Amino acid sequence: MALLTAAARLLGAKNSSCLVLAARHASASSTNLKDILSNLIPKEQARVKTFRQQHGKTVVGQITVDMMYGGMRGMKGLVYETSVLDPDEGIRFRGYSIPECQKLLPKAKGGEEPLPEGLFWLLVTGQMPTEEQVSWLSQEWAKRAALPSHVVTMLDNFPTNLHPMSQLSAAITALNSESNFARAYAEGINRTKYWELIYEDCMDLIAKLPCVAAKIYRNLYREGSSIGAIDSKLDWSHNFTNMLCYTEPQFTELMRLYLTIHSDHDGGNVSAHTSHLVGSALSDTYLSFAAAMNGLAGPLHGLANQEVLVWLTQLQKEVGKDVSDEKLRDYIWNTLNSGRVVPGYGHAVLRKTDPRYSCQREFALKHLPKDPMFKLVAQLYKIVPNILLEQGKAKNPWPNVDAHSGVLLQYYGMTEMNYYTVLFGVSRALGVLAQLIWSRALGFPLERPKSMSTDGLMKFVDSKSG
């Protein structure tokens, strides 16, 4: 307890609630995640019930006409437990910043990057896991990883011109045949047990996703070669990179980092909100997550890192690989003056450099400092924000996660840009499925906001102003 109290002081008041929760259950040394959840959930249910009884009618915020027409930006309308996006600090996973997660989460033997299993444990429980708990999760996912034969057959028979994200979504939907929740619901299970079945489905799906994703990659880009077998002695990311046919240890380390930092980003983004919305209809884990992946496949959500690489490649083609700052400034101004944006810069919520960009930059500085594409990205980081500030249009002139991730993947030989969003999808499962468990545990109802027509909204405004 003393150690946790000291940690609370070190990490600050914003993390204290997370640490108090951890302290309350510090004696729970079980390596079985479901057992720990069984202890946590009743207490959290009681806490939320009391909170709603006391403050259920409290006004949280106002809704403006611009919010309704502007994609509900800034509208507070969701409860999402696993992560919070602060405009000035960036993402916090259960109260922990990315640098804190990099420092505190368990790592593979000899590795330096956090294991995604540890982040999932943190997202689900609010507690920093032990190495033993993370090892248990790695082994548990290895046990659950096998794909049913009909999904394998389906993947093997997709046409090669079908987009990797379409294949991913279809395969996840087909895995719905394995849903524990769907079967139990059809048999009339009590709603207090919903979370237990959703938990099983989430664990199964996360375990199987690397196999699905690797099979898509091998079929499209490696002549349909076998993904091989899961090794129960390896962690989730290591098995994934092996199945992708990448054996470079640094690439495995990159994948651990990538899968960790792309896992969750508040509840209002398209993939997280879609999963939450579809899940509120009591659609099972597979249907909810497949819907989320269809949202992620949209160019405004999950395709941004491809757009960055296309732009960087075009830049190099037009001005050369070793470009001066002056020529680079001219190119950026030409891009802006032609009505286009600089891909990878700005964010709908953030008002600072994305910490997910920063940790990828640190990885590149350590492992590929002389790579020409990275040097260009670093040069842009030095120049673009000042130009965007000078232009005066951007609310956030700083780079986001997409400004960097594609460059790292390219360096290690993964040049198939159409596939990058699949990696994003595998990672995003950790966050949205952790939340899905809690949505059912807390009994969140069917999401059903009220819509208005333009005429109705105009009449409403007239009645207020008249």
Curated annotation (Swiss-Prot):
It is found in: Mitochondrion matrix. Pathway: Carbohydrate metabolism; tricarboxylic acid cycle; isocitrate from oxaloacetate: step 1/2. Methylated. Trimethylation at Lys-395 by CSKMT decreases citrate synthase activity. Residues 1-27 form a transit peptide. The modification N6,N6,N6-trimethyllysine is found at K395. The active site is at H301, H347, D402. It holds the Pfam family Citrate_synt. Expressed in the head region and flagellum of epididymal sperm. GO terms for cellular component: mitochondrial matrix; mitochondrion. GO terms for biological process: acetyl-CoA metabolic process; carbohydrate metabolic process; citrate metabolic process; heart development; oxaloacetate metabolic process; tricarboxylic acid cycle. The modification N6-acetyllysine is found at K76, K321, K327, K375, K382, K393, K459. The modification Phosphoserine is found at S226. The keyword Transcription does not apply. A motif (SIFI-degron) lies at residues 2-21. Oxaloacetate binds at R356, R428, R448. It comes from the Eukaryota. It catalyses: oxaloacetate + acetyl-CoA + H2O = citrate + CoA + H(+). Keywords: Acetylation, Methylation, Mitochondrion, Phosphoprotein, Transferase, Transit peptide, Tricarboxylic acid cycle, Ubl conjugation. The modification N6-succinyllysine is found at K57, K76, K103, K193, K321, K327, K375, K393, K450, K459. Homodimer. Key enzyme of the Krebs tricarboxylic acid cycle which catalyzes the synthesis of citrate from acetyl coenzyme A and oxaloacetate. Belongs to the citrate synthase family. This is Citrate synthase, mitochondrial.
